[in-house]
């Protein structure tokens, strides 16, 4: 079973051209969205149209024996309490945003905020996905982080542009390759019913360009809907202009799991060094869980004791460090390369003579001699 839009994204231009002709679609703009819309309108014979068009099954690599399109409710349905009847039906939240909207006025009043301001939270969300896949990219239970930024209705355009820029900067700050990130505007046919404008931050995975975060102008839709259902005002009083109004919202919504997958996929590197394969996780030093590993070259001649003292001093300075004394020094380097540790410090025979150690860079594998008493200062500069 496939989501139609995802299935079409994996088709060749020739196949898309064929189905466009069958459905009498002239424009190539937002082509997949238009094809999906047309297939839904021709729901009763959509399977035949897909077969006639030569839509390929990604698993078999052959034209699929397609059924007619069906629409699904992606919300998780459940029952509260011991009695399983219509009165106990509930749905797991598909997004974290609605809790923010319900509590908007409470947060605004108790924290004495003035517009514009944002409320952010992180938590579990659930979607009954038609098909899961690509490891943790698409799952039915996931961690979501969302920010609802409340502002005057006539200022949403400028704030949408502002948050698009800020969110792109955030992904860049994680060390993710800039050439593999893009900001894609939604076409009119793609927009959600509550949104007047939306942008997706996308990353180019091995399986193609896919969404990491959506930034949308939700207008006053959500607060309006909650007011209609509850008969309670969710308005803001502007003391300067002496007026009440419903704030508009610019939303930034990202999946934590997808962000983590992006960081790992972007950092994972396999390269050949001196005829040997090397696997390295090129994490940005600022997000690497361990910043530096310390190795005694040998487990004798006071090298372990000196190494442990260096580790303790580094930890006491607030830098995450790791002590590794097992195996050859080459294997220890490789272990830390795979774990994404940016720097390695080796205590060797010269250390016993001149109180210096070797500092190794993970990415370049270059080494330099530095004095033990300058280790922390040098690490702070590099990090």
Short names for language-model regions:
Residues 1-383:
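NTP/phosphate- and nucleic-acid-binding module
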């Amino acid at each position: 079973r496939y989501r139609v839009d995802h299935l079409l994204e994996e088709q060749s231009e020739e196949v898309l051209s064929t189905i466009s002709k069958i459905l009498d679609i002239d424009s190539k703009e937002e082509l997949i969205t238009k094809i999906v819309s047309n297939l839904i309108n021709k729901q009763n014979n959509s399977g035949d149209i897909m077969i006639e068009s030569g839509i390929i099954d990604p698993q078999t690599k052959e034209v699929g024996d397609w059924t007619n399109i069906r629409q699904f409710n992606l919300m998780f349905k459940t029952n509260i309490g011991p009695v399983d009847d219509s009165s106990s039906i509930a749905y797991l939240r598909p997004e974290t945003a609605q809790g923010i909207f319900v509590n908007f006025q409470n947060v605004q009043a108790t924290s004495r905020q003035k517009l514009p301001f944002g409320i952010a939270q992180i938590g579990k969300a659930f979607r009954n996905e038609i098909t899961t896949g690509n490891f943790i990219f698409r799952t039915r239970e996931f961690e979501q982080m969302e920010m609802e930024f409340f502002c005057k209705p006539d200022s949403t355009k400028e704030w949408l542009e502002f948050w698009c820029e800020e969110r792109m900067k955030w992904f860049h700050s994680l060390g993710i390759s800039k050439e593999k990130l893009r900001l894609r505007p939604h076409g009119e046919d793609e927009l959600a019913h509550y949104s007047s404008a939306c942008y997706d931050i996308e990353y180019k995975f091995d399986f193609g360009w896919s969404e990491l975060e959506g930034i949308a102008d939700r207008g006053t839709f959500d607060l309006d809907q909650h007011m209609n259902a509850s008969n309670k005002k969710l308005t803001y009083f502007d003391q300067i202009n002496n007026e009440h109004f419903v704030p508009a919202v610019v939303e930034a919504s990202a999946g934590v799991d997808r962000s983590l997958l992006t960081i790992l996929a972007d950092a994972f590197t396999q390269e050949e060094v001196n005829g040997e394969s090397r696997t390295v996780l090129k994490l940005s030093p600022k997000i690497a869980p361990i910043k530096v590993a310390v190795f005694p070259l040998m487990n004798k001649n006071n090298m372990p004791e000196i190494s442990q003292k260096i580790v303790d001093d580094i930890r006491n300075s607030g830098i995450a460090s790791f002590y590794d004394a097992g195996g050859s020094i080459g294997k220890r380097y490789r272990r830390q390369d795979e774990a994404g540790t940016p720097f390695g410090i080796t205590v060797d025979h010269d250390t016993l003579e001149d109180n210096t150690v070797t500092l190794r860079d993970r990415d370049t594998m270059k080494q330099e001699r530095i004095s033990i008493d300058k280790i922390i200062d040098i690490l702070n500069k590099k990090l």
